[in-house]
């Protein structure tokens, strides 16, 4: 039996890591917040919190209570649990923790939370608050394992997709109630209204958009633009997510290999 992995976060990048780990036979439990705000929710196992169940690229994720985790894992399903991180640590005692919340800072993950602790993206330092960091910035170092030092700092500039950076990310201009008028996979024209924050229109061409009915803060990310206009991309795990997921899987398998080597030497 492979060691249990606890994944903090169920967004699109975390889901790429969950997919890679599941394909390699690792049992994974996702820890999500009660009201997730992922943009690309069609490719997020954490969307099971809203739907009850989420199917993504052959694997099923299900929103369950902590008491149901063991039975859910036995069914080959990915449990998505909204209990506190501390409660999951105490109850499940995972061998591996992956923090893929992507908040650009460490929200409480500690190196002694598990035998192997992995941080995804900026906000972590390999060999300090986590054992290893996975690079998330697009480019040459994407998906690399960093055992000594931090990931590249957040630049605040979205990665280049289809020739666009700042233009492809849409933020709210005020706090209020967000209501979507367009949906994931819709093709829209530039400046077309895709939704409202209260009565203020939001305009863009989108591949992802927040679930309607959420209260958002000022400058909250509402939508993600993809000028490539490939509808299938809206429903499949992205190249970036899989690259980061590959880095997570490498860190896990390298740790297992080294642990087994140490055991053979005894």
Language model segments and positions:
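Well-ordered secondary-structure scaffolds
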Residues: 1-266
